[in-house]
Amino acid sequence: MAQPRIGQRVIVDVPATTANLGPGFDCLGAALDLNNRFAMRRIEGGGERFELIIEGSEGSHLRGGPENLVYRAAQRVWKAAGLEPVALEARVRLAVPPARGLGSSATAIVAGLMGANALVGEPLSKEKLLELAIDIEGHPDNVVPSLLGGLCMTAKAASQRWRVVRCEWTSTVKAVVAIPSIRLSTSEARRAMPKAIPVSDAVVNLGALTLLLQGLRTGNGDLISDGMHDRLHEPYRWRLIKGGDQVKQAAMDAGAWGCAISGAGPSVLALCAEDKGMAVSRAMVRAWEAAGVASRAPVLNVQTTGSHWQPADDE
């Protein structure tokens, strides 16, 4: 195992994720077929040097430097492998907009981990990368499906070991993700939540989560509709999203089975049958337009393969 050559380059594709899906707060997430692409290469210089090049206007506020999430994740790999840090450049084709509830920070973490690991011959297993990703992010619901793909339920067992269960999401269930031009930080969304919740609310969520998972497995719209309800976080977060209630109602009126805040928001996730996808998409965009917010609402599939890397020619 050796340090990467100057100019050595890898390309890492990392999917967007939608977390919580209503009742699965901080434990349930799914990868979507919308990817950020990171072209990472070693450049001249020692550790603490990281250059970031963003393709796309959404990331104009993002900066390089040693505190960047991509580079912080890369440093964790090198430390675990017993290697000294090296200077890196990342050129990012940004399709997952930041601060929209689609796991953009998870894509940065996973790309940094996977890219750095690939550059030094993959000394760390995927299980170790997963452990590092959760530790950096602080919660598993985005980084786990971002790395592994599909619909993932993650929980910390009594042994303190993270356990991941891949759940089935039938292809007949489509995800419409309405992505607004407004932003909402995860920290702000978390501050809106209470420190404690009633036991009755926790019980409702446990039942709803069971119904939702069965509905996603079978494509049963009634189960999805009954399961896509939450009392832990959404009652406190919808008020932070301008026009959010109207967007949710528009999606339901257009035929969606259920609707939820995607991650911490402000994007809104609607689940529906394939033949309802475009109608739900148009209705959500119109509702946000009426609230004075520009948006787009792609109809997406669940991405089942997760993140992957490929070698690229040296530069």
From Swiss-Prot:
Function field: Catalyzes the ATP-dependent phosphorylation of L-homoserine to L-homoserine phosphate.
Stated name of the protein: Homoserine kinase
Protein family: Belongs to the GHMP kinase family. Homoserine kinase subfamily.
Subcellular location: Cytoplasm
Pathway the protein acts in: Amino-acid biosynthesis; L-threonine biosynthesis; L-threonine from L-aspartate: step 4/5
Broad class of the protein's primary localization: cytoplasm
Pfam families per record: GHMP_kinases_C (PF08544), GHMP_kinases_N (PF00288)
A single GO cellular-component term on record: cytoplasm
EC number: 2.7.1.39
GO molecular function terms listed in the Swiss-Prot or TrEMBL record: ATP binding; homoserine kinase activity
Binding-site positions, ATP: P97, P98, A99, R100, G101, L102, G103, S104, S105, A106, T107
Chemical reaction(s) catalysed: L-homoserine + ATP = O-phospho-L-homoserine + ADP + H(+)
PANTHER family with a match to the protein in the record: HOMOSERINE KINASE, HOMOSERINE/4-DIPHOSPHOCYTIDYL-2-C-METHYL-D-ERYTHRITOL KINASE
GO biological processes: threonine biosynthetic process
Keywords per UniProt: Amino-acid biosynthesis, ATP-binding, Cytoplasm, Kinase, Nucleotide-binding, Threonine biosynthesis, Transferase
Cysteines engaged in disulfide bonds, as pairs: none
